[in-house]
């Protein structure tokens, strides 16, 4: 049997790029909670002792940007300079302007257009992907890398591994078999974890704790064997981390946010963007479409693409590819997708309830992936029942 190796990586919430994603989405949540019609394009950058929030926001909401920044950093665990950032004493810079009136008139007519008339906030193309290799209908390499990162944060915050600090990265290589287009994971080939730590812990303690408290609870035993390779803090030392170690910027972890390198990506980031930005809402609706195709038994694996022009409600194109795993021809599946999903941005916002803020709704998406999550706020993960004529056995 021919096999191949595929690798996906993740970073946890203390990575400086992810800190920025979370601040940007915390701002979005605050805007939508007070004003669901808010138009938000919020970027964040960070370096030692500094967080800057900038972009274009038009909203009726009264937003305390500095408080949002400090609260978000504090919740992550950046509470002193020695861990990479001090939430209460770092500098916070804010440079927010209103949305360009040229964009506003073209996209939503300065809030005069009905939902079905709202145009895309920009041009672009987005991809949704699904595969039957996991219960989440997500790639196993991505799922495991993401869950390892989430587990790192969990054992740091609950005190199981008190030597952990907020920053960290994970990577998982899985050995796969290609079953006529469907992906069948056979085993985990390599596990890589690089995590920030305090100065007192030894490398042996790090390796022991990571295997016992992070890897074993996350990776099913059936995927591990005597040949699985473990690289646990292979650089030997990772005390300096967070914004002290590296600069951070919103939108630099788009593969981690999506499918871990599987499928495809149109290049647009998610965090800090309201639903008129099809980089986000378009990617959410095509994930629901791809997931629904697989969940309804139309295919074992599927990718869906949609594309837009700025100011135009209707998509320019919709594309479906089932990698040869479709139960019926892809052309018929494409017709089913077009009949069951409304790709107009205003209707995506309504059908996926994307204008609802509060509950840290979009902040939750900004770490550990936007897809494959079991959370009622992730409305795009709800499978739509699709009607199709199943061929007789």
From Swiss-Prot:
Its cofactor is Mn(2+); Mg(2+); Co(2+); K(+). This is S-adenosylmethionine synthase 2. Belongs to the AdoMet synthase family. Homotetramer. Induction: Repressed in roots by ABA and mannitol. Mostly expressed in roots. Also present in stems and leaves. L-methionine binds at residues 56, 99, 246, 277. HAMAP family: S_AdoMet_synth1. Pfam families: S-AdoMet_synt_C, S-AdoMet_synt_M, S-AdoMet_synt_N. PROSITE patterns: ADOMET_SYNTHASE_1 (PS00376), ADOMET_SYNTHASE_2 (PS00377). SUPFAM superfamilies: S-adenosylmethionine synthetase. It comes from the Eukaryota. Its EC number is 2.5.1.6. NCBIfam families: metK. It is an enzyme of class 2 (transferase). GO terms for molecular function: ATP binding; metal ion binding; methionine adenosyltransferase activity.
């Amino acid at each position: 049997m021919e096999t191949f190796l595929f690798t996906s990586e993740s970073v946890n919430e203390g990575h400086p790029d992810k800190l920025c994603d979370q601040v940007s989405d915390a701002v979005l949540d605050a805007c939508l909670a007070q004003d669901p019609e808010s138009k938000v394009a919020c970027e964040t950058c960070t370096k030692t002792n500094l967080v800057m929030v900038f972009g274009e926001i038009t909203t009726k909401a009264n937003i305390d940007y500095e408080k949002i920044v400090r609260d978000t950093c504090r919740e992550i665990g950046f509470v002193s300079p020695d861990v990479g950032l001090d939430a209460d004493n770092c500098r916070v810079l804010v440079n927010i302007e209103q949305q360009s009136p040229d964009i506003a008139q073209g996209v939503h007519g300065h809030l005069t257009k009905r939902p079905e008339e709202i145009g895309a906030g920009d041009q672009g193309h987005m991809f949704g992907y699904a595969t039957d290799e996991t219960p989440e209908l997500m790639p196993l390499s991505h799922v495991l890398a993401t869950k390892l990162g989430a587990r790192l944060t969990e054992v740091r915050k609950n005190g199981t591994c008190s030597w952990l600090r907020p920053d960290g990265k994970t990577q998982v290589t899985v050995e796969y078999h290609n079953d006529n287009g469907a992906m069948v994971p056979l085993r985990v080939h390599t596990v890589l974890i690089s995590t920030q730590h305090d100065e007192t812990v030894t490398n042996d303690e790090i390796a022991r704790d990571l295997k016992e408290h992070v890897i074993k609870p996350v990776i099913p035993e059936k995927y591990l064997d005597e040949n699985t390779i473990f690289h646990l803090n292979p650089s030997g030392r990772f005390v300096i981390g967070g914004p002290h170690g590296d600069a951070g910027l919103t939108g630099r972890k788009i593969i981690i946010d999506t499918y871990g390198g599987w499928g495809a990506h149109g290049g647009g980031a998610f965090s800090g963007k309201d639903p008129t930005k099809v980089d986000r809402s378009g990617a959410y609706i095509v994930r629901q479409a791809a997931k629904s195709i697989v969940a309804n038994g139309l295919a074992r694996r599927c990718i869906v693409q949609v594309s837009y022009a700025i100011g135009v409600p209707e998509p320019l194109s919709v594309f479906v590819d089932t990698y040869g795993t479709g139960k019926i021809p892809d052309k018929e599946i494409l017709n089913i997708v077009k009949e069951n999903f409304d790709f107009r941005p205003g209707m995506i916002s309504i059908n996926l309830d994307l204008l609802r803020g509060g509950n840290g709704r979009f902040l939750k998406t900004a770490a550990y992936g936007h897809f494959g999550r079991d959370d009622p706020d992730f409305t795009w993960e709800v499978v739509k029942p699709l009607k199709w004529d199943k061929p007789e056995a």
